[in-house]
């Protein structure tokens, strides 16, 4: 096992499967993470893009992720046995001070749109991407990454998930058991129609109770 994953520097092994492993990473992976997310979004939704546009988007995502990163940030990445990134997702506990993507893109503040009561915590889930050409089951990997991302929300007594979700992916999430609330109109962001949503801890449990076991987190 040590030999297989010797290339990993600041990543903690979470689970190993036949074709890939999932790691918990830290801020040192944000540059690689941002490039992966932007490239995969363009591959999936557009196909081709100018190099300058790609570079600008990667820089924007990197800057935003570094600004939002904190002690309660969890980054999960999947790598194949050669170390190539195959998938990613990130969740963080909002400190009520940093500007959320939800605010920046949609002008929506969770304290106004959901609850202002200080007892509620808001966890932002984002930066989900999967390499659809990897040959693995992307659907299974999605469920594994999402189960890991919502784990801290499920473990928090009064909590909400907030996110900006691709409209097609949102339909999949709802079919898998999420109960979501749309917070505003969709906007075209990073190559796809994106919907601002929230989900309470109870709304997450329909998914988590079924699929949390995929990574041994439930």
Language model: regions and residue ranges:
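Acyl-donor binding region in acyl/amide transferases
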Residues: 102-180, 184-187, 191-194
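Intrinsically disordered, low-complexity, positively biased terminal segments
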Residues: 2-7, 68-72, 92-97, 205-218
